């Protein structure tokens, strides 16, 4: 599934290197910003003549909306992708999407991703054996 092998991993990497990493790695930031931009272009073309990714509303739209909604934190300009922007606005207007995006919002607000205690939970953990 395209979201699982493309948009999710690439957007996740740009979020990591752009917003959470303890050191600035310009090459990594630019690489993933550009790859997400390319993937947004693919979605924009796909949405040129249809309201949803697969034509009708489907799990494909549900899986992608959370990632595309983070366009600003991914270093993207949604206005470069008018079909994708229309799709995102349509998705965000759906009652079920609104409810889903509201879940846990209070838990996500105010978290400092640069706080060493937060980063200790997120990074440099290894599997323990034995």
Mark where each language-model region is.
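Acidic/histidine-enriched, glycine/proline-rich intrinsically disordered or flexible terminal extensions
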Residues: 105-130
């Amino acid at each position: 599934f395209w979201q699982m092998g493309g948009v999710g991993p690439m957007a996740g990497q740009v979020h990591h290197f752009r917003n959470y990493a303890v050191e600035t790695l310009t090459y990594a930031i630019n690489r993933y910003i550009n790859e997400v931009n390319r993937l947004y272009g693919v979605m924009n073309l796909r949405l040129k003549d249809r309201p949803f990714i697969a034509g009708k509303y489907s799990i494909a739209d549900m899986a992608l909306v959370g990632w595309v909604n983070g366009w600003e934190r991914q270093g993207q300009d949604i206005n470069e992708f008018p079909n994708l922007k229309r799709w995102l606005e349509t998705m965000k207007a759906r009652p079920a999407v609104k409810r889903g995006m509201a879940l846990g919002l209070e838990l996500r607000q105010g978290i400092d991703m640069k706080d060493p205690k937060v980063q200790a939970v997120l990074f440099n953990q290894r599997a323990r054996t034995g």
